[in-house]
Each structure stands twice: as structure tokens, then as C-alpha cells.
UniProtKB/Swiss-Prot annotation:
Protein name: Porphobilinogen deaminase
Organism lineage: Bacteria, Pseudomonadati, Pseudomonadota, Gammaproteobacteria, Pseudomonadales
Miscellaneous comment as given in the Swiss-Prot or TrEMBL entry: The porphobilinogen subunits are added to the dipyrromethane group.
Keyword annotations of the record: Porphyrin biosynthesis, Transferase
Matching InterPro entries: HemC, Porphobilin_deaminase_cofac_BS, Porphobilin_deaminase_N, Porphobilinogen_deaminase_C, Porphobilinogen_deaminase_C_sf
Amino acid sequence: MSTREIRIATRKSALALWQAEYVKARLEQAHPGLQVSLVPMVSRGDKLLDAPLAKIGGKGLFVKELETALLDNEADIAVHSMKDVPMDFPEGLGLYCICEREDPRDAFVSNTFKSLEALPAGSVVGTSSLRRQAQLLARRPDLEIRFLRGNVNTRLAKLDAGEYDAIILAAAGLVRLGFEDRITSTISVDDSLPAGGQGAVGIECRSADSEIHALLAPLHHIDTADRVVAERALNKRLNGGCQVPIACYAVLEGDQLWLRGLVGQPSGGTLLVADARAPRASAEALGVQVAEDLLSQGAEAILKEVYGEAGHP
């Protein structure tokens, strides 16, 4: 076993650093003697905290700087939250590992109310996600959705300061950072369909670096990967970045994959839903099939409206 060093490019947020440390520990466990170090950096998405994500440029907000580090040989792998990873990669880079998925659900967090259903009319709910907003308002048009950005600690502090009656966050992020006790209730995927890849960690590296590919192989979780491939194929067919009101979630049932996709107006006025099953070997085709169903229902008009407001394709 080579003892070469692996340098991990990562964002500096607490959650990103947790993910990088997780990958570091898994690599060291799989390959005793391997030297693994972190190369923390700040992404554009981390710098622009005063505007909704959908308005500051959709795709690659949290990964571009990390990809530049790979291309410039300043790092060997980049660790990403899969829901932030664009569908297409720069020439010379690719996604070579998807780790086992954590809980993909959204979490309801409140100091006063036990669940979404318990919120009184007019309650203020914080989220930065158009996907969550569309589904929340479809169920509860009487709620006020208010913009919420920042890292997990910042968002919890804003809730504790009384700026919101409740906030919606990814359950996986709260669990990973030790805030499991702050989850008031988890929201079922039937009530809040997750973002594609939510809860999964992906590893990007140089396409030609076969030694790195071999080192990553023990971390690759094929069941998670098949599910995420279907979800990402749906996103790609809809030309979706990570900041659009698109949700998708795949489940393995034996050798069959079941995939549900959703496109919603941020106002909650219209929610389009489609689902289908296929052999897991056809994960990518399944994603395209469900996306085509959504397009046939009018998804393109909803997404064009959102992109028009955001000012980017």
C-alpha cells in the first residue's frame, strides 16, 4: 500500500469540515499508513450570505473553488454534499465515490411548536430553499416563509433569538453536527420530498488519477449511488441546479428502484408530482423518465418562471 498523501479540498463551514473529517477517517481506516490532510477554502456560496441562493447564481455555488484546487493540483479530492454538486463536471474531473447516505429527510425545528401541523396561521418559518418553500406553502398557505441563510449554528441562533417561529433544515446536517436534540420532528418524505442527493456525501477527483480512484473504492456505497444516480438524472433532464424548486427521492425495493420527482411553484400554487419504478441497472433512464413525466405536466413553465426571477439559466 502506497503511503502517499491525500489532500482533501473542503469548504470551511462546520458541516463541510465534518464531512471532510468523516472521509479522512474512512480513508485512514481503509488504508493504514495513508497520510490524509485537509485543504479548507471558502466558496462563493459561503461569501454571499445576504441574498437568497436562487438569486445569486444557481449551479456550482459551493463547489467551483474546490474544483479549481483539483485542477491546479492543490488538492487530490474534493468532498461535497451531494445536493450541492452540479450535474456536469469540468473537463478532467469526475465524481468517483458516493458514501452511504444519512437520513435524507427535512427536519422541523422549533422552540415552541411540536410539528408543522401545530403551527398557527401566520407563523414565520425560515428556509433558504425554494424546494422546501413550494412544498410548505402547498400544504400550509397560511404560513409566512422568510429567507434564512448562514451555517447551521447561525440559523439556530436566529431561531433562538425569536426571528422565526420555526425553521426547516436537513436532518442529516443537524445529526452530523451533534444537534440531533434540536430536531423537534422529522418531516416525512411524503410531506417534504428531499433535494436530489440530500444526506449523501460525494467525492470528486481528477479523472486520470487511477491511484486515487482505487483508494476511494472502499468508501463507495453502491445502494446509495444507484439512488443518487436516478435523482441526479432527473435533475439534469430538468436542467436543475441545487437552488430550484425541484425535489426527487429514490428508494431501493429489492432490485427495483422507485423514484418520485416534484416541481413546484415557490408560491405553493402548483405542485407537479410523478413517480415510476425500474430495475436498479436503469437508474439513469428512470430519472429521465420521471423528469419527462413532469415536463409533460408543465414543469418547464414553472422552472422558466423561477429562472427568470433569478436572472440565470
